[in-house]
């Protein structure tokens, strides 16, 4: 089982390239895809994330931004007039962007954030704007393990979609054939011993 950052590619690529890439596109992505079920699900997950932050007494700025987002979503649900709905949409997207930025800055391992980042990165990989710069020894190691019949799994805080896209769009081509499965934050925390046991049972 491999991690991604610092294991198969430089941490700096994720921090300096991928995170800013998604951050610059939060607003455009949400506005252009607002009516899609996927985005509505992601916005709902953001609200749930805020509620979880409240439960644990989080004091980071993300908690305050989440409160504003939750209020905006409530306003939209209560609106019946089209003009009010459009105003609510703009308010929600604006609040969501601030919340996503706050989560990013606070380095909160938010599944909701990771899903939205993954959707944005998906477009970037398909358009050729993103390419994963693997360490030089990674392609050979993956190929060697495949020849030996050793299964390789990935576990990262990034969404499964992001992981799949990353290995399918590397600086040396598509290496996804060497990966047997992917785990993300929906599978549990990296620091949880019980979750690690469940991974081994699954693979």
Predicted feature locations:
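Substrate-recognition element of Asp-dependent hydrolases with the DxDx(T/V) motif
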Residues: 118-119, 128-171, 182-185
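Phosphate/adenylate-binding glycine loop and adjacent helical scaffold
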Residues: 111-117
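Structural motif
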Residues: 103-111
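Multi-pass alpha-helical transmembrane bundle typical of ion/small-solute transporters
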Residues: 188-189
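Conserved Lys-Pro-Asp/Glu-containing loop-to-beta segment of HAD-superfamily phosphomonoesterases
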Residues: 192-203
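Asp-based phosphoryl-transfer active-site loop
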Residues: 1-16
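Conserved phosphoryl-transfer catalytic core
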Residues: 14-102
